[in-house]
Each structure stands twice: as structure tokens, then as C-alpha cells.
Amino acid sequence: MIEPLLFGIVLGLIPVTLTGLFVAAYLQYRRGNQFGL
């Protein structure tokens, strides 16, 4: 059995991690376009 608190933390971190990766990829993509690469 997984503790509810630990389960809640994992469920909370997953969307934050996915959002962080998406934002980082978007910023890197946009920055590359600004330099014409």
C-alpha cells in the first residue's frame, strides 16, 4: 500500500514536471528561432 500523502505528492509532481519540460522545450525552440537557427 502506498501512503496517501506520498501518492498525493506524486500526483502533484507529475503535471508540474510535464509542464516544466514543455515550457523548457518551448522556450528553447522559440529562442532558436530568434537567432535564425
From Swiss-Prot:
The chain crosses the membrane at residues 5-25. GO terms for cellular component: chloroplast thylakoid membrane; cytochrome b6f complex. It is a single-pass membrane protein. SUPFAM superfamilies: PetG subunit of the cytochrome b6f complex (SSF103446). It is found in: Plastid, Chloroplast thylakoid membrane. InterPro entries: Cyt_6/f_cplx_su5, Cyt_6/f_cplx_su5_sf. Keywords: Chloroplast, Electron transport, Membrane, Photosynthesis, Plastid, Thylakoid, Transmembrane, Transmembrane helix, Transport. GO terms for biological process: cytochrome complex assembly; photosynthesis. GO terms for molecular function: electron transporter, transferring electrons within cytochrome b6/f complex of photosystem II activity. Component of the cytochrome b6-f complex, which mediates electron transfer between photosystem II (PSII) and photosystem I (PSI), cyclic electron flow around PSI, and state transitions. PetG is required for either the stability or assembly of the cytochrome b6-f complex. Belongs to the PetG family. The 4 large subunits of the cytochrome b6-f complex are cytochrome b6, subunit IV (17 kDa polypeptide, PetD), cytochrome f and the Rieske protein, while the 4 small subunits are PetG, PetL, PetM and PetN. The complex functions as a dimer. This is Cytochrome b6-f complex subunit 5.
